[in-house]
Amino acid sequence: GVVTAEQIAALNEVGINRMTAAAAAQADRTWAYGHIVVDEAQELSPMQWRLLMRRCPMKSFTVVGDIAQASSASAASSWSQALEPFVGERFTLDELTINYRTPAQIADAAVAVAREAGYEVSAPRAVREGQWAPFIHRVPPEHVVAETVQRVSDEVALGDGALIGVVCSPAQYTQVARAVMETHADRTGTAEDAVENQVLVLTPWEAKGLEFDVVIIVEPQQLLDDAQGAVGDLYVSMTRPTQRLHLVGTSMPAGLGAEA
């Protein structure tokens, strides 16, 4: 699994047919790497892990990810489950110990939901306790959208300019986005026109990697059901806020407390 000096020299020759290392590796099914770095590794299926392991005979990897954020039903529920079929116990697991973004009360709720779903999730220590536990709003199905709009209105009315993320499943996106925009047209946007807007309506996938002062999750149980029980989309959504979290729906996932 070593690139030779001749291969490196050939790749640096100036010529009309010059290929990048990435293109050469893609074209050559026998190409092997000495070390592979995998980001968002929690998303990989067993077949994808097998493919990578075959390309790295030395089994030398740097793997970065958060098991709880996996959105695929075929993803592993622990790093041991993902890696042991290929390397046994010959891997070192280093876990982050400090959570700088999410207040403890919200982070603990997200961890509780993930653990109830059967995921082995560590709980990094939050640097802030936070003033608010998650707000849980259980309402009849016909009131979910109206309740979501009301939560947005209440947050906007506080007048603190908080950035608000409304997260819902793709199936509900059009209905929720239309309702929020009808009430707050001058301040609402989507992932495609996020700049300058106080309120953004997003799917969990679009919310990944972002942070908001306030997050309102619409039908959190549906996010679990749509992912066939995989907790990633819900966990990602719950860990986006820096201040307040609202969950609006007809039912709530296991691990959450009573209504606020």
Question: Language-model features: where?
Answer:
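An amphipathic alpha-helix/rod signature
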Residues: 1-2
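Conserved helicase motor core of SF1/SF2 NTP-dependent helicases
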Residues: 5-7, 17-35, 42-260
